[in-house]
Amino acid sequence: MVALHESLSLISMDPLAFLTDQFNSAKCAIFCGAGISYNSGVPLMPDIKKKVLSGLPMNLKDTDELLNCKMPFELFMECLVENTANTSIMDLFALGKPNNNHTWIAELAKKGLLRIVITTNFDELIETALNTAGVRYQLIYRENEFDSVDWESSGLKVVKIHGSIHDRLNIAVTIKKVSGRELVH
């Protein structure tokens, strides 16, 4: 009953105090997506769709339909990868420099307050910020790497669940698998 009581008191705690307590326990993970890199110049999905579609020979009606459809990002990217030899769209994920979000993650990691960073981002801005801060980390982004990770070991792990711009072929495979799951569900 004491454990339950302690848990309930943490829930009623001031949110900032709660987060501070959790970070100080060094048991924290951060999960982040596309928005974290937006201020670094990496475009969000709607902007990517507009850029891609503006470069294709399509009529306005078809372009509008594709812009307004609820197609998952992964499926859109899979269609793009499979139907065009132009891979320059992937260069969009190589834009920018780390912003305050990436620097904050690196500072938390440098202080030993993080165990894992999980991201859906293809860009390498988190890694760049960690390198700049002198933080050692294990990068995990290929499917075959997940089975060999010692999740209990110390040290920061950066998990890129959609792959990395560093390995464009792996991104295509990941996108295909995720978009396939989206269609099945």
Give short role names for the model-derived ranges:
Residues 2-185:
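Conserved catalytic-core helix/loop/strand module for nucleotide-ribose chemistry
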